[in-house]
């Protein structure tokens, strides 16, 4: 790479072409340049809109004139002169609606407390947010460059996306971990899909959620939830009434808790396995009602996806596994494992800026896990060189070479 760059007439272009940077990185980098230019034009920030009652179409107020200036500065409203700048007219309402969509807040065309807060997010804060996500993109560029086909789950956007030949071909809604049980950020290879899956309760969920319910009413709970207990040593099913539940504890519990296949299974009718130390997987769910919520932080860390059977068909990418074939397996009620022809990389990411929208208007997503701040602090921290453990003493200032 270095030799080729030196021989090239355009080193920067050569390196960019060689790296084949992901469109997200390039688009985010361009967005950063655009917002820095805006800051220069606007003297460092957008005009503020003062606090006050909710502004709606038909109202007149000096605050409306300030709202106009704010939306003109960020591009949702043109700067065409109007007879009465203090009148909240239909055109201004459309501009507010556009801003609300871009800011990922409730769309009603009125400027209440939530919209006012979003309007008064400083331009510098948006620049900082872009910088944070540009840094995140750098972390995974090498892995993305090594793959033509992959899945990206953006936790902050509650979406799962399938890429073929580095082009997004499909997207669906996702539910992610609660704010106190955050979905982790990592990469792993999807190996297989299980239809009509069982659910073996992970240790953390067993300790926090399931074991207390078993201790309270083991027979009733296992019956209601279609759960069986399996002895770790023998692999045989154990009658819950035969267990001394008073003595049971997370450290003294020699059983697996397994939920049988069925419509009430926590994993729904399909799970997508990419082995990892976090016990995280993609799966269907028996709580589909939450997909209509805007903020979808409902799981214990795994990723629940909408339209899982379409996802399975697209992931398998095999004419033998069409919709009818998948439905036929589901109808049997029997657990079936289907291996992918090739491992499919899965990237569980956390990006709070989306520059790759269909209309070209970037989206700034809420930092639901409160993760942006730590990265921004690190980016602005003074540079500090940490030598490796086996570095010569002179590198650490303890002598001379």
Question: Residue spans of the language-model regions?
Answer:
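Well-ordered beta-sheet/strand-loop patches within structured domains
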Residues: 1-401
């Amino acid at each position: 790479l270095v030799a080729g760059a030196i021989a090239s007439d355009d080193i920067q272009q050569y390196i960019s072409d060689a790296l084949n940077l992901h469109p997200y990185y390039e688009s985010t980098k361009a967005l950063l340049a655009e917002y820095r230019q805006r800051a220069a034009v606007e003297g460092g920030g957008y005009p503020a809109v003062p606090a006050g009652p909710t502004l709606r179409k038909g109202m007149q107020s000096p605050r409306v004139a300030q709202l106009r200036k704010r939306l003109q500065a960020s591009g949702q409203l043109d700067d065409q002169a109007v007879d009465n700048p203090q009148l909240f007219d239909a055109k201004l309402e459309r501009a507010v609606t556009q801003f609300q969509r871009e800011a990922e807040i409730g769309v009603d065309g009125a400027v209440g407390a939530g919209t006012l807060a979003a309007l008064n997010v400083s331009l510098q804060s948006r620049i900082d947010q872009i910088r944070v996500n540009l840094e995140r993109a750098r972390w995974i560029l090498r892995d993305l460059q090594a793959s033509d086909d992959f899945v990206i789950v953006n936790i902050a956007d509650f979406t799962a996306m399938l890429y073929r030949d580095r082009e997004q071909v499909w997207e669906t809604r996702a539910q992610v971990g609660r704010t106190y049980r955050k979905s982790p950020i990592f990469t792993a290879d999807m190996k297989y899909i299980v239809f009509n899956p069982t659910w073996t309760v992970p240790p953390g969920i067993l300790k926090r959620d399931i074991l207390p319910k078993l201790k309270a009413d083991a027979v009733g709970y296992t019956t209601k939830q279609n759960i069986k207990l399996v002895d770790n040593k023998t692999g045989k099913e154990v009658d819950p009434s035969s267990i001394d539940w008073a003595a049971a504890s997370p450290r003294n519990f020699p059983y697996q808790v397994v939920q049988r296949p069925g419509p009430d299974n926590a994993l729904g009718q399909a799970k997508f396995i990419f082995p990892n130390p976090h016990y995280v997987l993609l799966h269907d769910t028996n709580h589909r009602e939450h997909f209509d919520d805007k903020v979808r932080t409902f799981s214990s860390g795994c990723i629940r996806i909408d339209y899982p059977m379409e996802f399975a068909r697209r992931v398998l990418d095999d004419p033998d596994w069409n919709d009818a074939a998948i439905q036929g397996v589901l109808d049997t009620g029997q657990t079936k494992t289907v291996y992918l022809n090739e491992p499919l990389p899965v990237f569980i990411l956390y990006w709070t800026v989306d520059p790759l929208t269909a209309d070209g208007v970037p989206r700034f997503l809420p930092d639901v896990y409160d993760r942006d701040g730590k990265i921004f602090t690190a980016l602005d921290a003074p540079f500090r060189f940490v030598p490796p453990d086996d570095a010569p003493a002179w590198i650490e200032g303890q002598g001379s070479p």
